[in-house]
Regions:
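Short, glycine- and charge-enriched coil/turn segments that flank and shape catalytic ligand pockets
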Residues: 37-46, 78, 113-122
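PRPP/pyrophosphate-binding module of the type I phosphoribosyltransferase fold
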Residues: 82-164
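Extended interfacial segments that mediate partner engagement and assembly in macromolecular machines
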Residues: 1-67, 71-75, 95
Length: 164
């Protein structure tokens, strides 16, 4: 993660995620590109893959914060975005779960929606918060089930402070 998920950054990310402040994505993307953009560009044919949310959660929020972040990073860095990964099963909110509970909850929760448009290259999963790794692992697993050779890395806006 580019930043620790604590104090003011935590408040800001919660506004971005839960309070409709999707315009924050542009500022976050500028900071992510400034601090870690060279890392993202070093991969072979990198493309951005936002971690999907379930359609019910999308209806509640009106947007997917990871997709907003990926689109803003795409504009800033010129990297393509592929939104062919889908959340096929709605899961309970993960915030209060242990790492083991998160892993169990996310088993089989992702799938490939659009294989035809799937680029060749390194998939960079984009998300707002890295907590236990369960979400990015489940996304990578879904991608590798369909394309075993797929290189998958992740780039998050924040990482929970207790993990550093």
């Amino acid at each position: 993660g580019t930043f620790l998920y604590q104090d003011g950054m935590r408040e800001s990310v919660e506004q971005f995620k839960y309070e409709g402040m999707k315009e924050y994505a542009k500022g976050y993307a500028a900071l992510m590109a400034h601090f870690e953009g060279e890392w993202a560009e070093r991969w072979e044919n990198p493309f951005l893959v936002p971690v999907p949310i379930h359609k019910r959660r999308y209806q509640e929020r009106g947007y997917n914060q990871a997709a907003e972040l990926a689109k803003a990073l795409s504009v800033r860095m010129g990297l393509p975005v592929w939104e062919g990964l889908a959340r096929t099963r709605n899961t309970a909110p993960l915030q209060q779960m242990s790492a083991a509970q998160r892993r169990r909850s996310l088993e089989g929760a992702f799938g490939i929606l659009d294989e035809r448009s799937w680029p060749r290259g390194t998939a960079i999963l984009i998300d707002d918060i890295y907590t236990s790794g369960s979400t990015v692992e489940a996304c990578a697993r879904a991608m590798r089930q369909r394309r075993p050779e797929q290189m998958v890395v992740f780039w998050t806006l924040t990482i929970r402070a207790e993990l550093t």
